[in-house]
């Protein structure tokens, strides 16, 4: 029952966020796919969750998505744009943070953090320009594009445009935390 409620809430947030302004088109250099992504299966027939699960670099993210019961929602049709922190990004959080977030009593907080990394629609690196866009958590993400590099809040996109059947993944070097 809780999973169904989460899916309904997730769908409602998606609908709400789709009504918000989206990132406009702009020219920018596309970041070359790095070794981080070359390990992933980038078959566009796979969902965002399947692509992430197929890459050890995202094992902490995948564990968090499972703990938050977001696998089904992020495997839905979408499309979604996911800013995916690497294992190193999670490891840079203060000691004990990840372990604490994975506890059942912190599930709502984990859902908010994870949905803060997701934007409705498929936004490629070439479409990003400086400005704000609403995340599925209902909070705005701030984008800055400078010298062909994209920053999302304080995180840097280190690999862009990893295609999936239900959207696109951009790999980031930090976990971005929503206002709590």
UniProtKB/Swiss-Prot annotation:
Per the UniProt entry, the signal peptide is 1-26
Question: What sequence ranges are listed for the domain FAS1?
Answer: 45-176
> Is DNA repair a UniProt keyword of this protein?
no
Q: Which UniProt keywords apply?
A: Signal
- What Gene3D superfamilies does the entry give? FAS1 domain
Asked if the record carries the keyword Signal, the reply is yes
Q: Which InterPro entries match?
A: Adhesion/Biosynth-related, FAS1_dom_sf, FAS1_domain
Cite a single Pfam family from the UniProt record.
Fasciclin
Q: Cellular component GO terms, alphabetically?
A: outer membrane-bounded periplasmic space
Its protein name is Protein sll1483
């Amino acid at each position: 029952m809780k999973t169904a409620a989460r899916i309904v809430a997730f769908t409602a947030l998606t609908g709400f966020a789709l009504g918000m302004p989206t990132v406009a088109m702009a020219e920018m250099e596309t970041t070359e796919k790095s070794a981080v992504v070359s390990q992933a299966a980038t078959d566009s027939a796979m969902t965002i969750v399947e692509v992430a699960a197929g890459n050890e670099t995202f094992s902490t993210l995948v564990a968090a998505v499972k703990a938050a019961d977001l696998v089904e929602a992020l495997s839905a049709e979408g499309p979604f744009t996911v800013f995916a922190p690497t294992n190193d990004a999670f490891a840079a959080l203060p000691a004990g943070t990840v372990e604490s977030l994975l506890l059942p009593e912190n599930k709502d907080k984990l859902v908010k953090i994870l949905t803060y990394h997701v934007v409705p629609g498929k936004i490629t690196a070439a479409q990003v320009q400086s400005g704000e866009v609403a995340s599925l958590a209902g909070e705005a993400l701030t984008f800055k594009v400078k010298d062909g590099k994209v920053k999302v809040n304080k995180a840097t996109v280190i690999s862009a445009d990893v295609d999936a059947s239900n959207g696109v993944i951009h790999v980031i070097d930090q976990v971005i935390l929503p206002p709590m």
